[in-house]
Amino acid sequence: MENFDKVKDIIVDRLGVDAEKVTEDASFKDDLGADSLDIAELVMELEDEFGTEIPDEEAEKINTVGDAVKFINSIEK
């Protein structure tokens, strides 16, 4: 399973949004209706899923689904 698909599954599960809405360009706040608590919980779940720690300064830069996938891809290299 690609990282995008894993991230998408987590978002659909955590936020309860339709899978079709979860695109690389989708903003967590504007397009998916996430608040700051939702985003913090998503970051924790991504950390668990990918076995990594996302520093706060990096987490603050994650505004879209694509941002999350890019970060995950960057740590797996």
Curated annotation (Swiss-Prot):
Q: Recall the GO molecular function terms of this protein's record.
A: acyl binding; acyl carrier activity
Q: Please tell me where this protein is predominantly located.
A: cytoplasm
Entry-annotated residues carrying O-(pantetheine 4'-phosphoryl)serine: S36
Pfam families, sorted: PP-binding
Organism superkingdom: Bacteria
Pathway per its UniProt entry is: Lipid metabolism; fatty acid biosynthesis
Post-translational modification, as annotated: 4'-phosphopantetheine is transferred from CoA to a specific serine of apo-ACP by AcpS. This modification is essential for activity because fatty acids are bound in thioester linkage to the sulfhydryl of the prosthetic group.
Q: Which InterPro entries match?
A: ACP (IPR003231), ACP-like_sf (IPR036736), PP-bd_ACP (IPR009081), Ppantetheine_attach_site (IPR006162)
Q: What does the entry give for GO biological process?
A: lipid A biosynthetic process
Domain Carrier intervals: 1-76
Query: Where can this protein be found?
Result: Cytoplasm
What Gene Ontology cellular component terms go with this record? cytosol; membrane
Task: Write out the entry's keywords from A to Z.
Answer: Cytoplasm, Fatty acid biosynthesis, Fatty acid metabolism, Lipid biosynthesis, Lipid metabolism, Phosphopantetheine, Phosphoprotein
What HAMAP family does UniProt report for this protein, alphabetically?
Answer: Acyl_carrier (MF_01217)
Name the protein family: Belongs to the acyl carrier protein (ACP) family.
NCBIfam families named in the record: acyl_carrier, PRK00982.1-2, PRK00982.1-4, PRK00982.1-5
What does the record give as the function of this protein? Carrier of the growing fatty acid chain in fatty acid biosynthesis.
Q: What is this protein called?
A: Acyl carrier protein
What species is this protein from?
Staphylococcus saprophyticus subsp. saprophyticus (strain ATCC 15305 / DSM 20229 / NCIMB 8711 / NCTC 7292 / S-41)
Q: Corresponding gene?
A: acpP
